[in-house]
A protein has these predicted regions:
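Long, low-complexity, charged/polar intrinsically disordered regions in eukaryotic proteins
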Residues: 1-32
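Short, local alpha-helical segments
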Residues: 24-25, 42-45, 66-74
Length: 99
């Protein structure tokens, strides 16, 4: 019985991740390449952002280090990143405090 419950939780977790990564963010065109790449970096750092260990500006620098290129000025990159962080919080039913 416990393995069925664990299987259901894992299935729900995967479904949430699928929903998160398939969500279109206004400003996705500000990034060169696959949206999965930059979204994955944001997703992996979501907890650090939520706990205020990492600022959006630092996250954008991290994205550059990982090879993500931007088609717009760096100051505009904040908007799609913030929107995506807010969407992750919404899917997980968590609240975010403004940074």
């Amino acid at each position: 019985m416990q393995s069925t419950e664990a299987h259901m939780k894992e299935k729900q977790r995967r479904e949430k991740i699928e929903i998160i990564f398939s969500h279109r963010v206004k400003g996705e065109s500000y990034f060169h390449g696959s949206s999965y790449q930059w979204k994955n970096i944001v997703y992996q750092n979501y907890n650090r952002i939520q706990q205020k260990e990492l600022k959006i500006e630092q996250l954008i620098s991290e994205m550059e280090k990982e090879g993500i290129r931007f088609t717009q000025h760096r100051s505009l990159i904040h908007y799609p990143v913030i929107d995506f962080v807010k969407y992750i919080a919404k899917v997980y039913k968590e609240t975010l405090e403004k940074q």
